């Protein structure tokens, strides 16, 4: 699924793929937020994904293949809509280049498992570091929220001009506080 000997299109929407017309195509899915609470950030994150694969394709692609990300779907940072978009892409793509949001990606994890679909969430949830939790399907990038917090504490202890004796932690429910 999602891999063909036919060449990738020259562009997806208005974004060029940089695909080599003599190579086959690997299609990747993308589930974003264009109109929900991350609507201001989602398109920039998508641009980063598309730019990476444009670069990869112009550098030779992956073996005998170029890579194209299909048109992104607007999940509005809503888990049910996220699943709806995943269902619309699952038969067309080899993997998800981007799945925006921790609760959203967790909501579709069982479906990813059924399809043996690898995903790269735009989320830094610490649970993805455990293969028995993420079923070995999540490709992490960047430091997790937990590691970022520990790094901040290490920096503060080493860099601030005061002797830190106590540290308070305030947690919130949701994406970040549950980590």
Residue ranges, per PLM feature:
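Conserved strand-to-helix beginnings and helix N-cap segments that scaffold or border functional pockets
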Residues: 42-43, 82-83, 109
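Structural motif
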Residues: 9, 65-90, 148-151
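Short, flexible coil/linker segments at domain boundaries that flank nucleotide/cofactor-interacting
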Residues: 21-23, 62, 162-164
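Extracytoplasmic ligand/sensor domains, especially the bilobed periplasmic-binding protein
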Residues: 10-16, 93-179
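Flexible, small-residue-rich helix->loop connector segments that border functional cores
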Residues: 52-62
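Extracytoplasmic "Venus flytrap"
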Residues: 3-4, 8-25, 29-50, 72-79, ...
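Residue-level recognition of the N-termini of beta-strands and the immediately preceding loop/turn
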Residues: 26, 65-70, 164-167
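Extracytoplasmic
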Residues: 23-25, 64, 91, 114
